[in-house]
């Protein structure tokens, strides 16, 4: 799993970001992520999954800092939103500002960042 994770980041930094930079005519060095949490449940977060997520977050922060431009989680269940309210208190304000957790009311927020014709 982690080899694919690192491969993805290395591909972003060494190939995709430079290609996007050339095409846009300006520096592109971060990504915009939309995560649909429709099928997420609290039982999905086993201790093994939590451990892997923690390790991934640590490695990402150490080796690929500031690569997150924005992340919007849509259809987040209440339990996830409640946990986020606690967790974000332990994170840097700059990081928190890049993450939006939304329930089924996500469309207005999403359209603040993405043109409607670019969404499925």
Predicted regions and their residues:
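Basic, amphipathic alpha-helical/coil surface patches used to engage anionic, phosphate-bearing ligands
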Residues: 1-120
């Amino acid at each position: 799993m982690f080899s694919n994770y690192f491969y993805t980041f290395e591909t972003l930094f060494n190939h995709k970001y430079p290609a996007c930079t050339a095409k846009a005519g300006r520096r592109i060095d971060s990504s915009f992520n939309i995560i649909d949490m429709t099928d997420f449940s609290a039982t999905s977060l086993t201790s093994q999954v939590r451990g892997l997520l923690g390790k991934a977050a640590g490695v990402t922060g150490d080796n690929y800092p500031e690569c997150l431009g924005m992340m919007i989680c849509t259809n987040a269940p209440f339990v996830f939103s409640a946990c986020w309210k606690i967790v974000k208190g332990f994170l840097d304000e700059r990081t928190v500002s890049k993450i939006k957790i939304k329930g089924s009311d996500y469309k207005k927020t999403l359209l603040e960042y993405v043109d409607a014709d670019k969404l499925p």
